[in-house]
């Protein structure tokens, strides 16, 4: 699901330099994509309320957006989820 606009900004703190996944370029790339795709305001998608900070996507679309393989995306999503950076919920 695309946000209503592709304008605006996200706040990224310098402390990110010390983040445990900062030195893994593919995980960092996926995390930044997630930050940029997150909804700024609540919205609805196919009758489901999507909260602020959440977004709807698929592994296939993340592969297309990042150039990573399905296995790479799944591995990095699992890492980000295990470390508490993201949560994954089926709609």
PLM feature spans:
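Long, low-complexity, charged/polar intrinsically disordered regions in eukaryotic proteins
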Residues: 1-25
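Winged helix-turn-helix DNA-binding recognition segment
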Residues: 3, 20-21, 38-91
């Amino acid at each position: 699901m695309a946000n209503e606009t592709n304008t605006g900004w996200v706040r990224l703190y310098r402390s990110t330099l010390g983040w445990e996944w900062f030195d893994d370029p593919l995980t960092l790339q996926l995390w930044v994509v997630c930050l940029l795709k997150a909804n700024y305001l609540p919205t609805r998608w196919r009758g489901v309320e999507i909260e602020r900070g959440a977004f709807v996507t698929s592994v296939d679309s993340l592969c297309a957006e990042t150039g990573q393989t399905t296995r790479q995306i799944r591995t990095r999503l699992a890492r980000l989820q295990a470390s508490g950076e993201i949560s994954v919920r089926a709609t």
